[in-house]
Amino acid sequence: MSVHKSIKRITASEIQAKKKQEPIVSLTAYQAYSARIADPHCDFLLVGDSVGMIVHGFDTTLPVDVDMMILHGKAVMRGSQRALVVVDMPFGSYEKSPEQAFSNASRILADTGCGAVKLEGGIHMAKTIDFLCKRGIPVMSHIGLTPQAVNHFGGFKTQGRDKSDWEKIEADAAAIEDAGAFAVVVEAVVEPLAVKLTEKLSIPTIGIGASNQCDGQILVMEDMLGYGAWAPKFVRRYGTLEQAMDTAIRNYAEDVKSRAFPSDSEIYKLK
């Protein structure tokens, strides 16, 4: 008689405990199949609002709503067993008030079964982070370049280059730490600042275009796999997904047109 051994899923507190330990590995995931493949290798999977751009073809993340995040969050939960699943709170779902944030965050956790939510912002979101954490919702924060504020930044620009910007990001990091966030994504900031934040904060820093000295790293899975003609400077291509897909589909199309597919071994015949 075989005994099924369930796999224990990583928790937010376990991610927090990895501060200054072995680097934390994370990727975005939007579908069950990609979550299944990434799950054995990642400490957490982020169901990012970047799903709007990668999967749904939007120009920015701004059109993404809570229903879309829940749909993809459910898929990633079904596809994964081990990694903590963190779901982004989309633009407009948490900024109005802590109560609004709690209503949407609690719905995301209840409907998807995920282990945490992520929201963008520093000092101005500290009250909301505190409100959520005190009510049992684990929160990952996101500072530096925050894609939901892309219009405010005037595009996707490196952060922390001047003194005032540097000091603001430092203040943001301190505020979200004090508010109870269990980790913080640090995106597209100058490397010395990322190193300083990692040294000063008691919670893990998850770098994306920051520094290899951060407590962990995250990339958009499709960028890392080589999907798309362009990727940000901070992306290392570990595969050639788009090229492989193009080759496979082209070969399929040629076989269909030449009637080479399906072959006798791929069809059903009367015995």
Curated annotation (Swiss-Prot):
Q: Which GO terms describe its cellular component?
A: cytoplasm
The UniProt entry, under InterPro entries, shows: Pantoate_hydroxy_MeTrfase, Pyrv/PenolPyrv_kinase-like_dom, Pyrv_kinase-like_dom_sf
- Give the record's cofactor note, including how many are bound: Binds 1 Mg(2+) ion per subunit.
Entry's localization field:
Cytoplasm
Indicate whether Transmembrane appears among the record's keywords: no
Gene Ontology biological-process entries: pantothenate biosynthetic process
Q: Name one GO molecular function term.
A: 3-methyl-2-oxobutanoate hydroxymethyltransferase activity
Quick one: signal sequence residues? none
Please state the Enzyme Commission number of this protein.
2.1.2.11
Q: Which cofactor does it need?
A: Mg(2+)
Question: Which biological pathway?
Answer: Cofactor biosynthesis; (R)-pantothenate biosynthesis; (R)-pantoate from 3-methyl-2-oxobutanoate: step 1/2
Active site, UniProt feature: E187 (proton acceptor)
Pfam families associated with the record: Pantoate_transf
Q: Tell me how this protein assembles.
A: Homodecamer; pentamer of dimers.
> What is the recorded function of this protein according to its Swiss-Prot or TrEMBL entry?
Catalyzes the reversible reaction in which hydroxymethyl group from 5,10-methylenetetrahydrofolate is transferred onto alpha-ketoisovalerate to form ketopantoate.
Q: Return the similarity comment.
A: Belongs to the PanB family.
Give the protein name, as stated in the record.
Answer: 3-methyl-2-oxobutanoate hydroxymethyltransferase
Q: What organism, scientifically named, is this protein from?
A: Bartonella bacilliformis (strain ATCC 35685 / KC583 / Herrer 020/F12,63)
